[in-house]
Amino acid sequence: MSITNSREFTINVGKIAEAEKWLSEGADLWKEITGKDAVIYKEGWGDQYKMLFVTTYESMGETEEVGDKVMADKRIVDWIQNGMTNGDLISGAVDRFFTTIKDTRE
């Protein structure tokens, strides 16, 4: 049974292209540090957008291990700081965890 984590970012008006670049850089950094794939989705219209940063884990324990690993890496901390404060790219982030019940791709 896998766990999917979705972090939903609310993108500030006029910052869509910058946020796409920032999240793409973060996904590459995430993969380098953790070995885990990340998928980025965009939802919205006009100037109102949300972007999802999605990663799948084998268990809740793995989510905690990976979280500890990335937060211990200064590059991730700097990346978060750049997007949230310095870059003013997002106005909020919400984490959600989903347990897979069935996946026909398996």
Predicted features along the sequence, with ranges:
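Short acidic DE-rich linear segments
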Residues: R105-E106
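An amphipathic, aromatic/His-enriched active-site/gating alpha helix that lines ligand/cofactor pockets
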Residues: K21-I40, G44, T56-V94
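Preference for well-ordered, secondary-structure-rich cores of eukaryotic proteins
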Residues: T10, T99-I101
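Active-site-flanking beta-strand signature of metal-NTP-handling nucleotidyl enzymes
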Residues: I3-F9, L52
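Short, surface-exposed ligand-recognition loops at beta-strand->loop->(often short) alpha-helix junctions
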Residues: T10-K21
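Short, flexible active-site-adjacent loop segments at beta-strand->alpha-helix junctions, enriched
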Residues: G44, I101-K102
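Short acidic/glycine-enriched loop/turn segments that link adjacent beta-strands
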Residues: G46-Y49
